[in-house]
Amino acid sequence: MAPTLHPLIDNGITKGDPNFSGGTLRCHCRSKPVEVLLGGNVAHNHACGCSKCWKPAGSLFSVVGVIPREQVKVTANEEKLHIIDDSAVILRNACKECGVHMYGRIEKPHPFKGLDFVHVELSDQKGWQEPQFAAFVSSIIEQGFNPKGTDGVRRKFKSVGLETYDTLSPTLVDLISTWTAQQNGRLPAKL
């Protein structure tokens, strides 16, 4: 039996709309849900196997994308949010009641500072960028997944057209390396 990766992948990937203008994310609380308005579409939307990202119940992976932080605004019940681990690079703001991660923000110097991490499946609107790749695939082993099953996981991703990586995609790794070289003075600040 094939593993459950994530509903947005297992149920068939729906192509997003490149002109999509954003929408509202809602936590899972039936009463007074936290609402976060995203003022645009996400980029680099991907399946993530790390142990820190929020995943729907029964899923091995989260699906997470990034959006400029100035396009992220909490519009309802902000008092219900708390940071799960304030020592982490990505400060994941989750609902205290239902546990859903609403957005992750980086405050420390980092190549992705200025981008917030969000789960667009929390929105009813259609048009969000579809998953582009799968990252940190081997990390599911750290969470108790039998390593003998990882080839099957990779095959399942490839069957829906997603490339798999054990870090991030090459484009994102290049961005991280470029930022690091710029910080160390090995590359000019503007390329």
Curated annotation (Swiss-Prot):
Binds 2 Zn(2+) ions per subunit. GO terms for molecular function: S-(hydroxymethyl)glutathione synthase activity; zinc ion binding. Zn(2+) 1 binds at residues 27, 29, 95, 98. Residues 20-166 form the CENP-V/GFA domain. It catalyses: S-(hydroxymethyl)glutathione = glutathione + formaldehyde. Keywords: Lyase, Metal-binding, Zinc. The keyword Lyase applies. Pathway: One-carbon metabolism; formaldehyde degradation; formate from formaldehyde (glutathione route): step 1/3. It is an enzyme of class 4 (lyase). InterPro entries: CENP-V/GFA, Formald_GSH, Mss4-like_sf. Zn(2+) 2 binds at residues 48, 50, 53. Belongs to the Gfa family. HAMAP family: Formald_GSH. This is Putative glutathione-dependent formaldehyde-activating enzyme.
